[in-house]
Amino acid sequence: MQSNKLRMAIRSTAAVAILGVAAQAQAVSFETGGYQTDIYGYARLNASYDIDSNQALSTRSGSYSGLVNNDDAADGHFGADAFQSRIGVKTVSPEGVKINVEGDFRGGGGGSLRLRHAYGEYNGVLMGQTWSNFTSFVGNTSTLDFDSLPGVAGYQSRTTQARYTTGPLSLSLEDPQSSFVTAPANAAQKDSLPALTARLQDSAGGLSYSAALLAHQVGYDTGSEDESAMGFATFVAAKIALSDMITVQGSLSYTDGANSYLYRSGENFGAASAYVDPASGDVETISGYGGTVGAGFNLGGGRSINVGYGIVEVDWDDAEDDGVAVAGQSESNSAVMANYQWTPVKNVMMGVEYAFLKRENVSGDDGDASRILFAAQYNF
């Protein structure tokens, strides 16, 4: 049965691959009144075949929601979309002020325009929305899955912020991200302070590395009760080139009261950061950790193979001991992803990827799924 499913998956992705032929797009760059402007982006097709239960999100990335107890779920699901496609504008003024606005089509669950970047930068000071400073791609293994491996370094998303960068050091004040286990606490959840981050990122020879810290407040205010606690997060990430052909990379993360920054923990993109003790009303933080390891192999001729593993674990023991209902919460999310990518002509990338996703809840219930992803991307 499993071999039949795999054959169906291969046939489906091969059929899509035949369609992956298009002309190369042209970049748009021009100067007006001393402003240097670039229009950039790409068109991208993502197609997936879920060998087991249907775990596809928009952009056909894999989801951990609904993965537990999926043994009896319908299997063999194909789908495709172009929601990852994006377009952006960058301009630099004669005085050196940089402005960037970019969007894609993953908004509203897929198909609507979504703002990715909108910021200005001058003399190391950046204000607006862009990648959180508590993010690094240094230790990431290249994946076709848009949402990638659990446990990669930091928030891995964009947020509004004020950032200052000098050399390899960046400091920022950011829109904070947090949630509670229970709905009543979430309804009264309150952010009184921005998240504070510091990141060091540099390289030396064949080694690239990054380390970061984050602190924020987690609290609630019902009008009659007002409680809060401090949450913290940290990560380290590195990549080393063993030769012209081989790189090895990975990351380690730890959070306590900041699981929104523990990538792909919980249902999909961040477990609860805290809970309210039913007896005292105090805010109690929840800790977690994660990590990734991977390797990339450059085969030459625009071809590469990439293999990565990632896992996140959340510690719900204290919440469970205090009588909070957490049996259905995800305790562990993990994934293996392996892909082959090639560039048939300049600015065109195609690839195929196998992924194995696994989740285990606090209750001990678990589930897993295999899936195959095909991608074709045309840059301009």
What positions do the PLM features span?
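Outer-membrane beta-barrel "beta-signal"
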Residues: 342-344, 348, 368-380
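Detector for outer-membrane/organellar transmembrane beta-barrel domains
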Residues: 202-330, 334
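Transmembrane beta-strand segments that form the barrel wall of outer-membrane beta-barrel proteins
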Residues: 96-107, 169-175, 209-217, 304-313, ...
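Outer membrane beta-barrel
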Residues: 28-61, 65-179, 190-193, 197, ...
